[in-house]
């Protein structure tokens, strides 16, 4: 595997082990060229999922987009990176279990929101503000009002 820091082609695997949910192999690697260490994940890909966007365009499902959006929503929250990886794996497995080759982007967003609602309401609000395209403070207030009534408060 190529080193992401210096670009050298040959890196050494120092440690391999399954992730907690057994959905991937975590490999610690070292670059003999620059001495950097980094982690890679190896996953089985059964088929390519295609995401159908709101405008009708299609693109291959990118698990890293889910991870990055979770990282942004959970920034400075008490959540470890491995938890974020497990959440992304769970969302991917749920999408694959549908048995469809194409999934609407709306479904992915809703799955992320469902997980965040249960896990961390601050992260849920952060994600919702982008996903639901909040434009002004009133949008937050309206959404918080709906959150309060839907959670039985």
Swiss-Prot record:
An example Pfam family from this entry, by short name, is ATP-cone
Q: Where are the zinc fingers (unnamed)?
A: 3-34
Q: Which Gene Ontology terms describe the biological processes this protein takes part in? A: negative regulation of DNA-templated transcription
For this protein, the record's InterPro entries field holds: ATP-cone_dom (IPR005144), NrdR-like_N (IPR055173), RNR_NrdR-like (IPR003796)
> What keywords are annotated for this sequence in UniProt?
ATP-binding, DNA-binding, Metal-binding, Nucleotide-binding, Repressor, Transcription, Transcription regulation, Zinc, Zinc-finger
Cofactor: record remark: Binds 1 zinc ion.
Q: Where is the ATP-cone domain?
A: 49-139
All disulfide bonds of the chain are: none
Q: Does the keyword Signal apply?
A: no
GO MF terms held by the record: ATP binding; DNA binding; zinc ion binding
The cofactor named in the record is:
Zn(2+)
Alphabetized NCBIfam families for the sequence: transcriptional regulator NrdR (TIGR00244)
Which family, according to the similarity comment?
A: Belongs to the NrdR family.
Q: Which HAMAP family match?
A: NrdR
Question: What role does it play?
Answer: Negatively regulates transcription of bacterial ribonucleotide reductase nrd genes and operons by binding to NrdR-boxes.
What this protein is called in its record is Transcriptional repressor NrdR 2
Which species expresses this protein natively? Paramagnetospirillum magneticum (strain ATCC 700264 / AMB-1)
């Amino acid at each position: 595997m190529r080193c992401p820091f210096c670009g050298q082609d040959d890196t050494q695997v120092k440690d391999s082990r399954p992730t907690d949910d057994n959905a991937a192999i975590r490999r610690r690697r070292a670059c003999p060229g620059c001495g950097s260490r980094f982690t890679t994940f190896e996953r089985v890909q059964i088929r390519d999922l295609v995401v159908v966007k709101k405008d009708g365009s299609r693109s291959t499902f990118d698990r890293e987009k889910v991870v990055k959006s979770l990282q942004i929503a959970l920034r400075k929250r008490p959540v470890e990176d491995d938890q974020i990886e497990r959440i992304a794996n769970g969302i991917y497995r749920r999408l694959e279990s549908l048995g469809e080759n194409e999934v609407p982007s709306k479904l992915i967003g809703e799955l992320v929101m469902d997980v965040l609602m249960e896990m961390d309401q601050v992260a849920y609000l952060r994600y919702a503000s982008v996903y639901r395209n909040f434009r002004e403070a009133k949008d937050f207030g309206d959404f918080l009002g709906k959150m309060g009534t839907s959670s039985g408060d």
